[in-house]
Amino acid sequence: MKNNFSKYQGLGNDFIIFDARSNNLDHLFSKNKDNFIEHLCNRNFGIGADGIILILESNNKCFVRMKIYNSDGSEPEMCGNGIRCLIAFLNDNNEINELSEIPIETKAGLILTYIDGNENIKVNMGEPILSPLDIPTKLLMNSLKVPNGVITLKDQILNVYAASMGNPHMIVFVNDIEGIPFQEWGSFLEKHNTFPNDTNVHFVEIIDKSNIKVKVWERGCGPTLACGTGACACLVVTSKLGKTLNNANVYLPGGKLEVEWPNQSGPVFMQGPALKVFSGEIDI
């Protein structure tokens, strides 16, 4: 059976989007997800993407429900770039019109989104989670109320931090982000037993109080050009540690996200672009 799809990207973090509100795609993906999703996301033998987004009817009075799969078939709780791509898809298909606030249901809960006049998409990412039990992580809370500890990797002792934006993130500060053995460190840390559910890994280089560089190793995907929830988690940790202000530009391999945490007892806001790459149809 042929199904329409659209491919969107947010800073190079790309997704295949299927509108599954009036078909049985959700059932098909749930039943056959592992090999099926890996094939669709394969850049040589499939469409090629970091993940797949299904648009579903919401059961909680939201505009729609977003279901997302990583390229390995796993289902993350939330994806910041993915939700921006979803909003761009809905906007391109004239579903949003004059709505000023678009509530989206996700596995991590209700997420509020907005489109500004330049079609930049702003997302209320909710309050960060810093409780080790809720992230979850075995790291212990330090005096600045951030989970923190050390991990030994061969001859390296890495000082690591943790935060969650509905999904777990490890933050590692480095002096030269291009000089680290990224593949080795990323793959090792993703599966480290300090994080019972595995984790996204972010290597952070501080430029100044308003700008940071981040390199992403995404749980279930490996290297990606950007991670929206990760950018937010990095800003939360850097601001808690006093390394940045409560708003900063986060420079990822795919481009820049603007992240703000105006009140440390409130939500984090992320803003950035999302664009259509192409659309088509595929036999499923």
From Swiss-Prot:
Subcellular location: Cytoplasm
Annotated binding of substrate, by residue: 13, 70, 80-81, 167, 200, 218-219, 228-229
Active site, UniProt feature: 79, 227
UniProt superkingdom: Bacteria
Annotated InterPro entries: DAP_epimerase_AS, DAP_epimerase_DapF
Pathway membership, UniProt: Amino-acid biosynthesis; L-lysine biosynthesis via DAP pathway; DL-2,6-diaminopimelate from LL-2,6-diaminopimelate: step 1/1
Annotated EC: 5.1.1.7
A GO molecular function held by the record: diaminopimelate epimerase activity
Gene3D superfamilies, sorted: Diaminopimelate Epimerase, Chain A, domain 1
Swiss-Prot/TrEMBL catalytic activity: (2S,6S)-2,6-diaminopimelate = meso-2,6-diaminopimelate
Cystine bridges: none
Main localization (coarse): cytoplasm
Site positions (Could be important to modulate the pK values of the two catalytic cysteine residues): 169, 218
GO biological-process terms attached to the record: lysine biosynthetic process via diaminopimelate
GO CC terms: cytosol
Keywords from the named record: Amino-acid biosynthesis, Cytoplasm, Isomerase, Lysine biosynthesis
Function as written in the Swiss-Prot or TrEMBL entry: Catalyzes the stereoinversion of LL-2,6-diaminopimelate (L,L-DAP) to meso-diaminopimelate (meso-DAP), a precursor of L-lysine and an essential component of the bacterial peptidoglycan.
Quaternary organization: Homodimer.
NCBIfam families the UniProt entry points to: DapF (TIGR00652)
Family to which this protein belongs: Belongs to the diaminopimelate epimerase family.
Protein name (record): Diaminopimelate epimerase
Gene name for this UniProt entry: dapF
